């Protein structure tokens, strides 16, 4: 039989390899001795919390021994990686993990980076500058509660619970290495989100409307960069007009000429005059709105955009007065 070997660190932070006279079973055993400054991390409750946090979904059983008792602390087959799990089970699990409900949940899987898991649609509005909490695992061990740049920049209405088997971590194991593989994985995840929304428009309009009510700003961001989704989503997107908020479908059906203003001050000055003349004017001062109008008009030549300004209205009224 082979002689057991021991690889030990000394107080001088050097290492030595020695033989052990004690018989040991086949395998490896790692013994860690905390330094005095870190003894508090090895108190039972603290240690268990850390162990569960990082190792909860490791694919092998992990046992914690304490006072002659043995406790299984992980779930080698978590519900969010179970293809047979129901939507309700996934929503319930997400509510437990993130302490927040979700509007909906859907599965993703990528070829690049071998990312697998579920994405939750947040039930509240978020700003582009706000960082949401996530759970990103690398080879089934928790890596970060940040999205690690796995999500596209516009996907702030999404919370991810995913595991990546084919991506690399930074040396500090605090995030994922930014390389072409991560970029390709992010692109696939972006396509999965778009496919999900496309499917809702076609098959579950009620759910799409719920998401649109909360996250129309983010849906506009998606539509502004994807012509196919622009065609699909545009009629449902809300725009502010001098006659209240209307979806674009109702604006387009009113007239093939769409009048709009580029900034809020112009809109405030124009809205009453336009209302008196019976015109419908869109306030395109908000982020993405003018871009969406112009891109949609280019894709639909039968539509004409007409930019309205206070000075132009005054000129038109002057011409009318001169003709009298």
Model segments located where?
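Conserved GHKL (Bergerat-fold) ATPase module
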Residues: 1-324
């Amino acid at each position: 039989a082979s002689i057991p070997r021991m690889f030990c660190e000394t107080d001088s932070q050097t290492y030595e390899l020695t033989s052990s006279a004690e018989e040991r079973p086949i395998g490896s055993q790692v013994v860690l001795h905390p330094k005095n400054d870190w003894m508090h991390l090895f108190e039972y409750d603290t240690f268990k919390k850390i162990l569960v946090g990082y190792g909860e979904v490791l694919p092998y059983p992990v046992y914690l021994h304490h006072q002659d008792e043995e406790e299984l602390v992980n779930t080698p087959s978590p519900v969010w990686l179970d293809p047979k799990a129901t939507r309700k089970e996934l929503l319930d699990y997400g509510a437990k993990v993130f302490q927040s409900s979700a509007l909906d949940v859907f599965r993703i899987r990528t070829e690049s980076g071998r990312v697998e898991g579920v994405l939750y649609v947040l039930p509240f509005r978020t700003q582009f500058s706000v960082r949401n909490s996530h759970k990103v695992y690398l080879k089934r061990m928790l890596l970060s509660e940040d999205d690690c740049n796995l999500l596209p920049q516009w996907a702030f209405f999404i919370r991810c619970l995913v595991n990546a088997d084919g991506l690399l971590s930074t040396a500090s194991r605090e995030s994922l290495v930014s390389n072409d593989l991560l970029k390709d994985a992010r692109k696939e995840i972006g396509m999965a989100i778009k496919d999900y929304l496309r499917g809702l428009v076609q098959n579950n309009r009620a759910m799409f409307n719920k998401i649109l009510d909360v996250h129309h700003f983010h849906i506009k961001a998606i539509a502004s960069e994807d012509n196919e989704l622009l065609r699909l989503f545009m009629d449902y997107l809300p725009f502010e007009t001098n006659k209240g908020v209307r979806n674009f479908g109702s604006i387009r059906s009113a007239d093939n000429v769409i009048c709009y203003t580029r900034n809020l001050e112009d809109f405030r000055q124009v809205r009453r005059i336009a209302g008196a003349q019976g015109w419908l004017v869109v306030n395109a001062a908000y982020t993405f709105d003018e871009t969406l109008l112009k891109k949609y008009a280019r894709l639909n030549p039968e539509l004409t955009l007409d930019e309205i300004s206070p000075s132009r209205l005054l000129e038109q009224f002057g011409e009318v007065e001169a003709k009298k």
